[in-house]
């Protein structure tokens, strides 16, 4: 009996000591399953012009997020918020269609993103736009593995525009 109690305490102490060390070495927290692969700018960023930022996001293998239009109202959808920037008009974000995925333990299929997916952001540049220009954005998502979902996360993104000579 004493051996079981000691083993239990040893597990608790190990978790308390090792978890912060793992985070300090750059390991992700539970649910941090999305990473930014690239931000591509389509079009020429010139004052008075229009461009589209294509944001490529990669989810870790075995994870999914609910699409921008979740299949059930209680699920948290994936949403990109683009902050205002001087000289920029932000258009409606384009989201990919979700994939229908049957998850064990749930009655209805889910509308999800898996693997790599792309978001598009149309940007109108005013005549007063000054380059280089950085437009901050945040991707809010909830990563899940099967029916197990983690706390919602935020992925910070920078959309960088530089005028071409």
Where do the PLM segments sit?
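Bacterial N-terminal signal peptides
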Residues: 7-19
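Positively charged n-region of N-terminal signal peptides that target proteins for export
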Residues: 1-6
């Amino acid at each position: 009996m004493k051996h079981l109690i000691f083993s239990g305490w040893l597990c608790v102490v190990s978790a308390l000591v090792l978890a912060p060390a793992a985070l300090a070495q750059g390991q992700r927290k539970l649910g941090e399953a999305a990473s930014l692969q690239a931000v591509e700018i389509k079009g020429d960023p010139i004052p008075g012009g229009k461009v589209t930022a294509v944001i490529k996001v990669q989810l870790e293998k075995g994870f999914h997020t609910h699409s921008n239009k979740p299949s059930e109202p209680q699920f948290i959808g994936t949403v990109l918020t683009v902050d205002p920037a001087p000289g920029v008009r932000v258009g409606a974000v384009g989201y990919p269609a979700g994939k229908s995925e049957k998850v064990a333990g749930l009655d209805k299929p889910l509308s999800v993103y898996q693997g790599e997916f792309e978001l598009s952001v149309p940007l109108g540049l005013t005549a007063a736009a000054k380059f280089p220009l950085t437009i901050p954005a945040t991707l809010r998502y909830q990563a899940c593995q099967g029916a197990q979902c983690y706390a919602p996360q935020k992925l910070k993104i920078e959309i960088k525009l530089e005028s071409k000579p």
